[in-house]
From Swiss-Prot:
Its main location: virion. It is found in: Virion; Host nucleus. A motif (Nuclear export signal) lies at residues 91-100, 117-127. It comes from the Viruses. The keyword Transport applies. Binds M1 protein. May interact with human nucleoporins and exportin XPO1/CRM1. GO terms for cellular component: host cell nucleus; virion component. This is Nuclear export protein. Mediates the nuclear export of encapsidated genomic RNAs (ribonucleoproteins, RNPs). Acts as an adapter between viral RNPs complexes and the nuclear export machinery of the cell. Possesses no intrinsic RNA-binding activity, but includes a C-terminal M1-binding domain. This domain is believed to allow recognition of RNPs to which the M1 protein is bound.
Length: 177
């Protein structure tokens, strides 16, 4: 999310620079403004989520009605009290997987049980890390074309943030392993 917002921010700064130099025609500037505004509007819809929000989204994705979310602690207790005969039922596995999501959400990264959940987290973190590395690479190329010292300072600052975020994600991945 931060990387895409960063790209939109850099695009906005580049647009301002273009306007200052007055090298574009008025129509091109308007097209670039519209494109930048559309990008910012699109990216703002992707807000950071907590584990609890992700759990609720997963529950909704699995077609559980929203009224049951208010009763989630009671439902979890009911799931834990299911008899052995019901465990053999075909509904038991999806219900059990829902309870695992809430248990995992409150745990330290190193104590998440080995399995599919840990693999999914690692896969997503590695994907985020690779996208941040690509963004860092693109920012390093953008530095070469910048002549304004303010823009240069902003890009260098954002590259540092990008690198620090990459290091934090790699550290988190190592703690999960």
């Amino acid at each position: 999310v931060k990387s895409t917002n960063l790209m939109a921010f850099v695009a906005t700064k580049m647009l301002e620079r273009q306007e200052d130099l007055d090298t574009c025609t008025e129509m091109q500037v308007e097209k670039m403004k519209a494109s930048t505004k559309a990008r910012l509007r699109t990216e703002s819809s992707f807000a950071p989520r907590t584990w609890e929000d992700a759990i609720k989204d997963e529950i909704l994705r699995r077609s559980v009605d929203t009224s049951s979310l208010d009763r989630w602690p009671e439902l979890k207790q009911e799931l834990e009290n299911v008899s052995d005969a019901l465990k053999a039922d075909s509904l038991w596995l999806p219900m059990k997987s829902l309870s695992l999501y809430s248990e995992v959400s409150n745990q330290e990264p190193s104590s998440i049980p080995i399995g599919e959940m840990k693999h999914q987290i690692l896969t997503r973190l590695k994907l985020i890390c690779s996208r941040l590395e690509k963004l860092d690479h693109n920012l390093s190329k953008a530095v070469l074309g910048i002549q304004n010292s303010e823009d240069l300072i902003l890009i260098i600052y954002n590259r540092d943030i990008c690198k620090n975020t990459i290091l934090m994600i790699k550290s988190l991945c190592n703690s999960l392993i």
